[in-house]
Amino acid sequence: MNDYCINKYYINNYHIKKAFNKRALMQDLIKKAGQVKLLVMDVDGILSNGQIIYDANGIETKAFSVQDGVGVKSLARYGILTAIITGRSSPMVDKRAAEMGVNHIVQGRDDKLIALNELLATLDPALNITAADCAYMGDDLPDIKAMQTVGFAATVPNAHAEVIKRSHMVTTRAGGTGAVREICDLILKGHGHYQDFIASYTLDEAKTQDNLSWILVF
C-alpha cells in the first residue's frame, strides 16, 4: 500500500512537471511569436504537402490548405507582413499567393538565406525589419541557413531531421494541411490579437450560452 502511494505520488509529480514544462515552453514560443513582423514561408512541404503532381500534359499541380489562407490573411489584418521564398518556380504559387494576399514572392532561389537577405534589403527602412524580426517556416536542408538566422524558426513533423533539430517549434499538422495556420495563430497570440480575431467570427457567447447548454443536455 505504501509502495503504491509512493509510486502514485511520483507518477502524479512527473505529470505535473511535464504539464508545467509544456506550458512554460508554449509561453516562450508565444513570446517569440510576439516579436514577429514578417512571416516567411517555403512552399513545397509547408504551404503544400510536398508532392508534385503532373497531369497528362505535363502541367504541374499542387494542393493548398484553405485554413492556411485564412491564417495568412489574418496576419495582414493586423499589419504583419508575409513572404514566400521557394526553390521552384510555378505560376500556381503566384496565383495562390495573390489569393492569400502574400506581400512578397521570391521563386526559383536555391540559396534561401541570400534570398531572405535580399528581400529584407528591399523593405521600407521605416518598417525596421531585420532577420531577428522574422519567422521562417521550412522543411528541408535548403531552408536551414535562413532558419538559423531568424528570430523564430518553425517546421512540420515530417520535415528533415536536421531541420527539426534547428527549429524552435514543430507544428502538429503537416505541410499543406494547416501547419501555416498554427504559426499564424501563434503569432496573433503573441501580438495580443488572437481573441479579437476570433471574436470577429463569433456571436456574443453570453447570449448564446442558454442555447448551447440546452443542446448539450439534450
Named regions from a protein language model:
Residues 20-114:
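Alpha-helical substrate-recognition element adjacent to the catalytic core
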Residues 1-41, 193, 197-218:
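Non-catalytic pre-domain segments flanking phosphatase-related domains
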Residues 58-62, 98-100, 104-109, 113-218:
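Mg2+-dependent phosphoryl-transfer enzymes with acidic/Ser/Thr/Gly-rich catalytic loops
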